[in-house]
Amino acid sequence: KMNDQIQAEFKKIFNGRFSTSESTRANYARGEDTYDPVLSKAVVFPETNEEVSKVLRLCNEHKIPVVPFGTGTSLEGNVVGNEKGITICLEKMNKILSVNVEDFDCRVQACVTKEQLNDYLREDGVFFPIDPGANAAIGGMASTSASGTMAVKYGTMKTVISGLTVVLPNGDIINTGSRTKKTSAGYNLTNLFIGSEGTLGIITEVQLRLSPIPVSYTHLTL
């Protein structure tokens, strides 16, 4: 249960990045869906894997529900708040961590959007091909196993993700997969988390496979 003592702990850890104001809670009460908004007890804005871990350890200890929130483009009610819980907004985790053009891969934090990433990659002649329509966050696309209009050629999120950093409900931080094109080293934990919609842990970093930008396009009308 969220009480004054727990709120004080969060404020001590996150300072101005923990809010219980009604206006802030209302801003993160739902996505772009038609569901009724639900205001969580508080909203916290972590910036690192370790800070997400601190939130989940504290919430796990006190049995407080959590709702991960990215860019809020969900149409299925994924990010509707919890009146007894905390919304964990990852919008400050929006850094492109590395790009390896020669190997056609990159690593990003969860709230990097597809448009942000492709704008960054354009001059290098590569792009991130999954396009679900909205300018979604990469972490949200991984959590919902997004696809899009180019899935026939480029596949879905399961096709282009080679590894993840995930914070488990108890606060443990794990890394799955690798940069290699194929690995037989143990269970495929990466695919376990893709599409899990935050129920198994919070995805904080994503390792992506990139594609060359097409030289030309052909449009067909049916």
PLM regions: where:
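N-terminal flexible segment immediately upstream of the FAD-binding catalytic core
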Residues: 1-57, 73-104
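Structural signature of FAD isoalloxazine-binding scaffolds in flavoprotein oxidoreductases
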Residues: 45-46, 76-94, 109, 150-170, ...
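Anion-binding (especially nucleotide phosphate/pyrophosphate-binding) glycine-rich loop
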Residues: 80-93, 98-138
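Hydrophobic, small-residue-rich alpha-helical packing segments that form membrane-like cores
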Residues: 116, 121-122, 130, 134-136, ...
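Conserved phosphate/anionic-ligand binding catalytic regions in large, soluble enzymes, centered on
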Residues: 192-202
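Flexible, low-complexity linker/loop segments at domain and module junctions
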Residues: 209-217
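Conserved small/polar residues in nucleotide/adenosyl-binding loops
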Residues: 218-222
